[in-house]
From Swiss-Prot:
<keyword id="KW-0689">Ribosomal protein</keyword>
<keyword id="KW-0687">Ribonucleoprotein</keyword>
<dbReference type="InterPro" id="IPR050063">
    <property type="entry name" value="Ribosomal_protein_uL29"/>
</dbReference>
<comment type="similarity">
    <text>Belongs to the universal ribosomal protein uL29 family.</text>
</comment>
<dbReference type="Pfam" id="PF00831">
    <property type="entry name" value="Ribosomal_L29"/>
</dbReference>
<dbReference type="InterPro" id="IPR001854">
    <property type="entry name" value="Ribosomal_uL29"/>
</dbReference>
<dbReference type="InterPro" id="IPR036049">
    <property type="entry name" value="Ribosomal_uL29_sf"/>
</dbReference>
<dbReference type="GO" id="GO:0003735">
    <property type="term" value="F:structural constituent of ribosome"/>
</dbReference>
<protein>
    <recommendedName>
        <fullName>Large ribosomal subunit protein uL29</fullName>
    </recommendedName>
</protein>
<dbReference type="GO" id="GO:0022625">
    <property type="term" value="C:cytosolic large ribosomal subunit"/>
</dbReference>
<dbReference type="InterPro" id="IPR018254">
    <property type="entry name" value="Ribosomal_uL29_CS"/>
</dbReference>
<dbReference type="GO" id="GO:0006412">
    <property type="term" value="P:translation"/>
</dbReference>
Length: 75
């Protein structure tokens, strides 16, 4: 597992949601800069997209685990 994923797993869900929002805003700014020809480091967009995907995956795993635990508790 990558160190980025390990760091993200240590954070709680609210922090992960904030990170996703911040990264999406950063990605949007980078896209505008690229469209205007101002962006220098376009490879960072790939890294940002991957980090967003990792964070959303962790959030989804937590939601599914919570639903599963609630379902088992109701049996």
């Amino acid at each position: 597992m990558s160190s980025i994923a390990q760091d993200l797993r240590k954070k709680d869900s609210l922090e992960l949601e904030k990170i996703v929002i911040e990264l999406k805003a950063k990605l949007l700014e980078l896209r505008f800069a690229a469209a205007n020809g101002e962006a220098e480091k376009l490879h960072t967009a790939k890294e940002i997209r991957k980090t967003i995907a990792r964070a959303l995956t962790i959030l989804n795993e937590r939601e599914l685990a919570e639903k599963l635990n609630n379902k088992e508790a109701n049996k």
